């Protein structure tokens, strides 16, 4: 019997192009096995129907994944107008039908109405938790759980293609936006129904789909080639300000102490900390009132010195 390759410590970020038909977790596990990585996590669930950008965080990168969850995102969505499905997408059953002879002008007006700061009720078929279980588990049993509306921002909706009943839109939005629900809202504004037939995440936190890699492409590379595709852990927090500390101050941070710091930095956001030779140490909080730095999330000493 062939022995499985031993798992190894891998640290970094893989920009994965998730294929259609796989859950985000299944895609994550396939990537983890390709890298023989000990630890892996992803940032932001994509439905099985959806494809596109799924950042995978290996090892120490997982410590900073939460900061990517808050990032803005962009999607390309394909709608079928005139039909509602039980799940809001093509995986569900058609449960209602209405007019599909929508004009481009009507569709443009509806898209404009759903742009900006809006409130959105998350769909039942989602990974949001209720009493420890994802909502989709209740939905599959026909149980409807009351959901509170969320404040979201839809920065733009651009119409890429329109030939009713088919419409393709490009959406830029804040975290927590459900494109299925947005598509239903666009249709409702017109007085009809809609569901998604395709969804692709094209951007998140400044990363683009052009930077991503498919599972098939990764499988055709050797270990060194795959490792060379990993981005460093600090790309997840590159939007925060940065500073450099000397070795003594870094040591204090790593020991749970608060080194003195007197530079002009914002105190209301995490700060990236680097050593004098450019090594990423982690995130700290600048406590301006006492001129001290407090550790928030730090790289493991062995990993950060590798």
Swiss-Prot record:
Belongs to the pseudouridine synthase TruB family. Type 1 subfamily. NCBIfam families: TruB (TIGR00431). Its EC number is 5.4.99.25. It comes from the Bacteria. HAMAP family: TruB_bact (MF_01080). Keywords: Isomerase, tRNA processing. It is an enzyme of class 5 (isomerase). The active site is at residue 47. Gene3D superfamilies: Pseudouridine synthase (3.30.2350.10), PUA domain (2.30.130.10). Coiled coil: none annotated. InterPro entries: PsdUridine_synth_cat_dom_sf, PsdUridine_synth_N, PUA-like_sf, PUA_sf, tRNA_psdUridine_synth_TruB, tRNA_sdUridine_synth_fam1_C, TruB_C. Responsible for synthesis of pseudouridine from uracil-55 in the psi GC loop of transfer RNAs. It comes from Neisseria gonorrhoeae (strain NCCP11945). GO terms for biological process: mRNA pseudouridine synthesis; tRNA pseudouridine synthesis. It catalyses: uridine(55) in tRNA = pseudouridine(55) in tRNA. This is tRNA pseudouridine synthase B. It holds the Pfam family TruB_C_2. One of its GO terms (molecular function) is tRNA pseudouridine(55) synthase activity.
């Amino acid at each position: 019997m062939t022995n499985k390759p031993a798992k190894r410590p891998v640290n970094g970020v893989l920009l994965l192009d998730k294929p259609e038909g796989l859950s985000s977790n299944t895609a994550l596990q396939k990537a983890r096995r390709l890298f023989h990585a000990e630890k892996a996590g992803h940032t932001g669930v994509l439905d099985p129907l959806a494809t596109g950008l799924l950042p995978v965080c290996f090892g120490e990168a997982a410590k900073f994944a939460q900061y990517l969850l808050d990032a803005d995102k962009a999607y390309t969505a394909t709608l079928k107008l005139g039909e509602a499905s039980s799940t809001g997408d093509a995986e569900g059953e058609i449960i209602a039908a209405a007019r599909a002879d929508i004009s481009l002008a009507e569709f443009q007006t509806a898209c404009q109405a759903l742009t900006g700061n809006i409130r959105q009720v998350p769909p039942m078929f989602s990974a949001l938790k209720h009493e420890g279980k994802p909502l989709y588990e209740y939905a599959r049993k026909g149980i409807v759980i009351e959901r509170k509306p969320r404040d979201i921002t839809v920065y733009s909706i651009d119409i890429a293609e329109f030939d009713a009943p088919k419409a393709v839109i490009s959406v830029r939005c804040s975290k927590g936006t459900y494109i299925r629900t947005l598509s239903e809202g666009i249709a409702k504004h017109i007085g009809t129904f809609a569901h998604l037939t395709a969804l692709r995440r094209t951007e998140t936190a400044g990363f683009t789909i052009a930077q991503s890699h498919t599972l098939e492409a990764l499988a055709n590379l050797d270990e060194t080639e795959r490792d060379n595709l990993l981005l460093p852990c600090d790309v997840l927090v590159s939007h925060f300000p940065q500073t450099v500390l000397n070795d003594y101050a870094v040591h204090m941070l790593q020991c749970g102490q608060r080194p003195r710091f007197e530079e002009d930095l914002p105190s209301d956001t995490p700060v990236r900390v680097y050593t004098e030779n450019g090594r990423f140490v982690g995130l700290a909080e600048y406590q301006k009132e006492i001129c001290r730095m407090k550790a928030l999330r730090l790289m493991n000493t062995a990993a950060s010195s590798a």
